[in-house]
């Protein structure tokens, strides 16, 4: 690992540790909005629900940016001697979001940050399209409820599809690191889980 690699990994982790839902709540609502939500998750959905539109947009943009910036900047510079380092740069902001250094027990799930990371990989479209496509499929065609199970199913299936479809093995490994981090966060979550349900979207 070279100095540049280490700096981008550290930068990604520290940027990921900024929880924009809490920051947005303080800016727009003068309160910690995550304290109002049942799952206490500092994510985009809770930002919209408990903080309002401006807080939600602020959180969404911040969480996308924290995933995008480290990956985009790292890939825009000189090519690393060890291409494997890209995998760790990809995973760093998501790990920071899930396990922020100042409050390890109260991080987020890393979903929006994952999408931001994959935007930073463009023109490598596979991870972004696979994750978005499967999320849409499980939300609009075969509906999996609640969101906890939908997210678990999406990340597992997206990881499998990316292994199959993405030729760049370092991007694949980065996705696997991200998926493992998100799934570990979900599995260790103490939030109360509603009854698992699968149904076709057009059937009520």
Regions from the PLM with identified roles:
Residues 43, 49-75:
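Multi-pass membrane catalytic core of lipid/isoprenoid biosynthesis enzymes
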């Amino acid at each position: 690992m070279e100095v540049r690699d280490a700096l981008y990994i550290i930068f990604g982790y520290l940027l990921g540790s900024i929880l924009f839902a809490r920051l947005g709540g303080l800016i727009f609502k003068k309160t910690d909005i995550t304290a109002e939500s049942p799952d206490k998750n500092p994510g985009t959905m809770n930002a919209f629900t408990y903080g309002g539109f401006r807080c939600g947009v602020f959180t969404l943009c911040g969480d996308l940016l924290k995933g995008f910036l480290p990956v985009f900047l790292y890939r825009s510079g000189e090519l690393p001697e060890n291409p494997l380092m890209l995998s760790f740069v990809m995973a760093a902001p998501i790990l920071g979001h899930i396990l922020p250094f100042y409050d390890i027990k109260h991080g987020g799930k890393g979903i929006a940050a994952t999408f931001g990371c994959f935007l930073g990989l463009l023109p490598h479209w596979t991870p972004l399209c696979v994750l978005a496509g499967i999320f849409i499929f499980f939300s609009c065609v075969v509906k999996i409820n609640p969101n906890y199970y939908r997210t678990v199913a999406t990340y597992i299936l997206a990881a499998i599809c990316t292994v199959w479809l993405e030729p760049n093995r370092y991007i694949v490994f980065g996705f696997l690191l991200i998926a493992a981090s998100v799934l570990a966060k979900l599995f260790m979550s103490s939030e109360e889980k509603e009854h698992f349900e699968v149904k076709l979207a057009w059937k009520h």
